[in-house]
């Protein structure tokens, strides 16, 4: 899978599916399930590393997990999902030079084929422009942007006409600058539908309604492995409880099969 395949899918009306992975086991699962795109998201900071937000995740951690995900794929290279890696907080916001170094490290040292970054302020647009000019495919991300949690929170975004027009303008700017796809998170469904019809690149939604070119979900949320799931990402099964019950069953079976009599006590030396 390559970035241009997603644009072809949009043109043909084929829905795009994108799931996250954070290690070789989760990668093997989402590949076997048939996901078009596998995102090594900085959400791994919360799913796998126990942080409260995505902000503490480092570039080295993203590289470490991307390498693990790549090792989890079993199909031939041309049959593998498109592997996209998040650029973590402050690896690209400080300017194009640092962004090229960070994105280049991820693509050179792992099997990632593209990077994803958040926002569309002028500074970010300049970063996208430089990355694209350097031959690095970029996926954009607007709406609820988790790296801006301290400024925007986890609230639904773009609720009024002015902010909606601004988001569409930002999306068009990202497309013009060279992004091959755009994630829209936690925005009104009518806004996502508008973006889908105004943009030539795929609009991939999460909490943005069904009228998108594709959908992305955090795999751990879909499997019900996390204690709490966002309202826009209901689990497909109660994986957490199933795992607990399986582990508890093994523990109880092991305990019940243990000898009921205590081993003889050793005689004291004196």
Curated annotation (Swiss-Prot):
Location of the active site: 185 (proton acceptor)
InterPro entries, A to Z: Pantoate_hydroxy_MeTrfase, Pyrv/PenolPyrv_kinase-like_dom, Pyrv_kinase-like_dom_sf
Keywords: Cytoplasm, Magnesium, Metal-binding, Pantothenate biosynthesis, Transferase
Cofactor: Mg(2+)
Pathway the protein takes part in: Cofactor biosynthesis; (R)-pantothenate biosynthesis; (R)-pantoate from 3-methyl-2-oxobutanoate: step 1/2
Cofactor note: Binds 1 Mg(2+) ion per subunit.
Catalysis performed (reactions): 3-methyl-2-oxobutanoate + (6R)-5,10-methylene-5,6,7,8-tetrahydrofolate + H2O = 2-dehydropantoate + (6S)-5,6,7,8-tetrahydrofolate
Subunit structure: Homodecamer; pentamer of dimers.
Full protein name: 3-methyl-2-oxobutanoate hydroxymethyltransferase
């Amino acid at each position: 899978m390559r970035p241009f395949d997603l644009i072809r899918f949009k043109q043909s009306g084929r829905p795009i599916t994108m799931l996250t992975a954070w290690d070789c086991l989760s990668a093997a699962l989402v590949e076997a399930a048939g996901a078009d795109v596998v995102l090594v998201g900085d959400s791994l900071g919360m799913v796998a590393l126990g942080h409260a937000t995505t902000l503490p995740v480092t570039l080295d951690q993203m590289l470490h997990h991307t390498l693990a995900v790549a090792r989890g794929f079993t199909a031939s290279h041309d049959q593998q999902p498109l592997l996209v890696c998040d650029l973590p907080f402050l690896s690209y916001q400080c300017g194009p030079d640092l962004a090229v170094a960070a994105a280049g490290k991820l693509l050179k040292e792992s099997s990632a084929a593209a990077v994803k970054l958040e926002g569309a302020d002028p500074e970010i647009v300049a970063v996208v422009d430089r990355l694209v000019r350097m031959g690095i495919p970029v996926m954009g991300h607007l709406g609820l942007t988790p790296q801006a949690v301290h400024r925007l929170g986890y609230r639904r975004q773009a609720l009024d006409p002015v902010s909606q027009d601004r988001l569409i303008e930002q999306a068009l700017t990202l497309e013009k600058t060279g992004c091959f796809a755009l994630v829209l998170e936690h925005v009104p469904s009518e806004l996502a539908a508008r973006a889908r019809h105004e943009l030539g690149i795929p609009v991939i939604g999460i909490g943005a309604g069904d009228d998108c070119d594709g959908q992305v979900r955090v795999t751990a949320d879909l499997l019900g492995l996390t204690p709490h799931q966002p309202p826009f990402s209901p689990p497909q099964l109660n994986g957490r409880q199933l795992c607990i019950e399986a582990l508890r069953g093994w523990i109880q079976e092991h305990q019940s099969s243990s000898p009921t009599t205590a081993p003889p006590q050793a005689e004291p030396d004196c």
